[in-house]
Design a protein with these regions (language model features):
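Substrate/ligand-engaging "lid" and interaction regions
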Residues: 1-285
Length: 285
């Protein structure tokens, strides 16, 4: 990104076309292993009100058996206040500094594909800080907001790009995505609503419902379609969905086996979501 002056290209790929967006949302890039002081200063700065996190599941160092912080070597390194190696360490030391300097409210929002992501992030951070100062851990527990969220957008791997994309122009940091996207945030904060304004950002009371419909209608049917398609000689999901046998199987599976098990909420249109999912599967990108 630095070689491109922080610009990157978003290729929004539809079934038949590519919409290209050149984006420059970053004022400055920092590297966690080198810029720990500046990162902690930014977290502590009272002008910082919202932090979003995208780090993948492993970055949380969460022990799913004990449901607590995994005290592995990297976490132990950070607890010993050596050169910080983890996201948990950066967030924790930044919040410790914030507690000492101003105690201002802050929202830390996980965008990772992880069920109850906000609760998990809150747990690992408070566990980490409790090893250093239990009073500060209590402040984080009570005052720092960690909303749970769910992002619904398919973002393909860019290691092997479609020919249509490679022929456009070179970009070392390009991102591919489908046109469909929703971001659900479990929080009714008027402040967040005023700061995160977009028609595809939706504030909800119960994120578990939206996690459930994504897992059951999108993820499960994607897997089922892939398995059946492979058995029938198809290489890609978009090829399988164009096979009448596969389409009928998935459509009936969703209508008869999945949707009836989901209790409707917030006037969410499950049938329309199913139609959107089947359309998304036709996207050959």
């Amino acid at each position: 990104l630095e070689k491109q002056n922080n610009y990157y290209t978003l290729y929004e790929c539809t079934e038949s076309d590519i919409n290209i967006h050149v984006l420059n949302p970053y004022k400055k890039l920092l590297f966690g292993l080198e810029d720990e002081k500046e990162i902690c200063d930014l977290i502590a700065n009272k002008e910082t009100k919202i932090i979003t996190i995208t780090v993948t599941e492993k970055g949380y160092h969460y022990n799913t058996i004990n449901k607590s912080l995994d005290l592995n070597e990297d976490i132990k390194n950070d607890l010993e206040n050596k050169k910080i190696k983890t996201l948990v360490g950066h967030i924790s030391y930044g919040l410790i500094q914030r507690f000492k300097e101003n105690k201002e409210d802050i929202y830390i929002i996980s965008c990772d594909n992880l069920s109850q992501n906000g609760d998990i992030l809150k747990k690992v951070v408070t566990d980490f800080v409790s090893h250093i100062d239990k009073n500060i851990a209590t402040w984080i527990e009570e005052k720092v907001k960690f909303p749970c969220t769910m992002v619904d957008c398919i973002v393909p791997n860019t290691k092997k790009l479609p020919k249509e994309v490679e022929e456009k122009f070179k970009d070392n940091s390009l991102v591919l995505c489908e046109p469909y996207r929703d971001w659900y945030i479990e929080n009714k904060s008027e402040f967040l609503k005023s700061q995160l304004v977009h028609e595809r950002i939706k504030f909800v009371d119960n994120i578990k419902f939206y996690e459930s419909i994504k897992l059951k209608i999108l993820n499960a049917s994607h897997s089922a379609l892939a398995y059946l398609g492979l058995l029938l000689g198809h290489k890609y999901v978009h090829e399988a969905i164009d096979d009448e046998l596969c389409y009928n199987f998935i459509n009936n599976y969703l209508d008869k086996e999945v949707i009836p098990t989901i209790k409707k909420q917030d006037n969410f249109d499950l049938v329309q979501y199913k139609k959107d999912v089947l359309k998304r599967f036709r996207n050959h990108f």
